[in-house]
Amino acid sequence: MGRFIFVSFGLLVVFLSLSGTAADCPSGWSSYDGHCYQVFSDLKNWDDAESFCSGQHEGSRLASIHSREEEAFVGKMASRTLKYTSMWLGLNNPWKECKWEWSDDTRLDYKVWTRRPYCTVMVVKTDRIFWFNRGCEKSVSFVCKFKAYSEDAAE
């Protein structure tokens, strides 16, 4: 009996470590590099998606992407969740003055554009990821992101 409990506990630990959801992210959210992410299949325009993300968790916004690795992580999540892998990111050009910015106020240090209107969608194909600019009024899926809770931050 003790051996069964030990083996069961070991399998549970392995399952939880491979599930992609860290203890510091809420259920249903995936963890990457200190942030929590969730892809939503609901179709919303950019403003409604941003508002929805803001209501999900303190500090949650449409996702900002800062590296190829982060982009690949979000792309993999999207391809598992969405039928059509086109989703809003937090990157927009709110005043239409060619001053692009992330909705979470992080620095624009990584970008992979293909075209140029006012809000940005990430499209995941089988072997490639593209960013397209699309009119903010279009309705597509979206991905939200927030900084993961840290035990150290609570002290």
Curated annotation (Swiss-Prot):
Residues 1-23 form the signal peptide. It is found in: Secreted. Disulfide bonds join 25-36, 53-144, 119-136. GO terms for cellular component: extracellular region. InterPro entries: C-type_lectin-like, C-type_lectin-like/link_sf, C-type_lectin/snaclec_domain, C-type_lectin_CS, CTDL_fold. It comes from the Eukaryota. Residues 32-145 form the C-type lectin domain. One of its GO terms (molecular function) is toxin activity. Keywords: Disulfide bond, Hemostasis impairing toxin, Secreted, Signal, Toxin. Pfam families: Lectin_C. Heterodimer; disulfide-linked. Shows greater sequence similarity to the beta than alpha subunits compared to other heterodimer snaclecs. Belongs to the snaclec family. Interferes with one step of hemostasis (modulation of platelet aggregation, or coagulation cascade, for example). This is Snaclec clone 2100755.
